[in-house]
């Protein structure tokens, strides 16, 4: 009698496990690869900035990393660097790259200007008025607005790949902000401390509609220039913001 009950319990557990597995969805937020930007411009949402040769290698590395994953949906920011990073992933899974405007880079008043350490836009007094409130921030798109649109993009990707996995290619700041929100950290932060290297994956696991875990991987970290890696110290004349 006891043995029979145990077998029944096992069967019920297996059914529950199978049902639960079907309702597990993973959404990978991928930061694009390195961009060709020899002038060191903070390009932001400006069109015309494409992946460098190294950036294309990073994109290929991401595709290799995800080749055996159950990817059924690939979507990207409308900016060229994001589309070009998404393309190898989509190709390896026989998919098209969809576009979601909500994955776009954060707006920034310094777009089009150089923004290095010890030089560039911050040395000009006319720009100091934009630096009055780091909590909003005063120089760009409010953090809370980034959270709203990025959560919307994540939820849409989850629904499109329900029970499978989705890839969303976006940009450093919005990826970091939405991760900070999900992990219940404050949204204002030191940009040098963002854990969001070029061609990295920030992966959100959903059970049903609820995020139950967040993971982070760097499949192309060996290709990333040292000054652009997470936690690296800034170098004069170079900015981590260039690859945002």
Identify the function of each model-found stretch.
Residues 27, 164-172:
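Generic beta-sheet signal
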């Amino acid at each position: 009698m006891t043995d029979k009950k145990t077998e029944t319990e096992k069967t019920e557990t297996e059914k529950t496990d199978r049902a639960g597995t079907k309702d597990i969805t993973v959404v990978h937020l991928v930061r694009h690869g390195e961009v060709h930007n020899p002038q060191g411009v903070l390009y932001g949402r400006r069109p015309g900035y494409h992946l460098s040769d190294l950036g294309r290698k990073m994109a290929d590395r991401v595709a290799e990393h995800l080749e055996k994953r159950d990817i059924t949906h690939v979507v990207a920011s409308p900016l060229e660097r994001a589309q070009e990073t998404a393309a190898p992933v989509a190709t390896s899974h026989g998919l098209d790259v969809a576009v979601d405007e909500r994955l776009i880079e954060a707006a920034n008043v310094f777009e089009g200007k150089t923004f290095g350490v010890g030089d560039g836009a911050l040395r000009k007094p006319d720009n100091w008025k934009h630096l009055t409130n780091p909590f909003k921030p005063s120089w760009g798109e409010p953090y809370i607005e980034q959270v709203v649109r990025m959560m919307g993009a994540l939820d849409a990707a989850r629904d499109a790949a329900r029970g499978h996995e989705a890839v969303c290619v976006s940009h450093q700041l919005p990826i970091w902000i939405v991760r900070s929100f999900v992990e219940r950290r404050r949204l204002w932060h030191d940009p040098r401390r963002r854990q969001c290297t070029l061609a990295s994956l920030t992966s959100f696991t959903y059970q049903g509609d609820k995020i139950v875990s967040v993971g982070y991987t760097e499949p192309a970290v060996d290709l990333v220039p040292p000054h652009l890696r997470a936690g690296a110290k800034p170098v004069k004349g170079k900015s981590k913001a260039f690859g945002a």
